[in-house]
Swiss-Prot record:
One of its GO terms (cellular component) is ribonucleoprotein complex. It comes from the Archaea. This is Large ribosomal subunit protein uL16. It comes from Natronomonas pharaonis (strain ATCC 35678 / DSM 2160 / CIP 103997 / JCM 8858 / NBRC 14720 / NCIMB 2260 / Gabara) (Halobacterium pharaonis). InterPro entries: Ribosomal_uL16, Ribosomal_uL16_arc, Ribosomal_uL16_CS_euk_arc, Ribosomal_uL16_euk_arch, Ribosomal_uL16_sf. Pfam families: Ribosomal_L16 (PF00252). Keywords: Ribonucleoprotein, Ribosomal protein. The keyword Ribosomal protein applies. PROSITE patterns: RIBOSOMAL_L10E. One of its GO terms (biological process) is translation.
């Protein structure tokens, strides 16, 4: 069965549901890795720091986080090469467990379905809860690679539902000159 639209899960309208020791059958996170680029480098080694900031309070499913991570990282690899000198980090982890009350459709569904009786729902995935103004991704790079980083983030925020801002947090004076 395919995923439901992000609009079903993007609003934070329920209390946090994260106690994994009480919950069975949680599917694994689709996020493959959280640190990309040059692992050994220290963020202080780079002159420029650029972040992708969410403009509203939202939940982002783990599939969307992975899709945006992949898109941004592939763009950086294409622009800078396999041994490109940058460091990228995904700052959010999908802790929130998402449930769905499955509904039967089609002929005879009224005899099979229970409607809203015992409607707690089955676990279908996880999501990250993100508040307004929090950073989802950060890239540390050199000034000549800043345009590639901005383009990577532009591609990344097309894969997630909330409006986002790309902010140069360090080294902005190097990009203007």
């Amino acid at each position: 069965m395919s995923d439901k639209p992000a609009s079903m899960y993007r609003d934070i309208d329920k209390p946090a549901y994260t106690r994994r020791e009480y919950i069975t059958g949680i599917p694994g996170s689709k996020v493959a890795q959280y640190k990309m680029g040059n692992f050994e480098a220290d963020p202080e080694d780079y002159e420029v720091q650029i972040s992708l900031i969410v403009d509203e309070e939202v939940q982002i499913r783990h599939g969307s986080l992975e899709a945006s991570r992949l898109s941004a990282n592939r763009r950086m690899l294409k622009e800078l090469g396999e041994d490109g000198d940058y460091k990228m980090i995904l700052r959010k982890f999908p802790h929130q467990v998402i449930r769905e009350n499955k509904q039967a459709t089609g002929a005879g569904a009224d005899r099979v379905s229970d409607g809203m009786r015992q409607a707690f729902g089955k676990i279908v995935g996880t999501a990250a809860r993100i508040n307004k103004g929090e950073r989802v991704f950060t890239i540390w790079c050199h000034p000549e690679d800043a345009d590639a980083a901005k383009d990577a983030f532009r591609r990344a925020y097309n894969k997630i539902s909330p409006p986002c801002t790309i902010k140069v947090e360090r080294g902005e004076e190097l990009l203007i000159a």
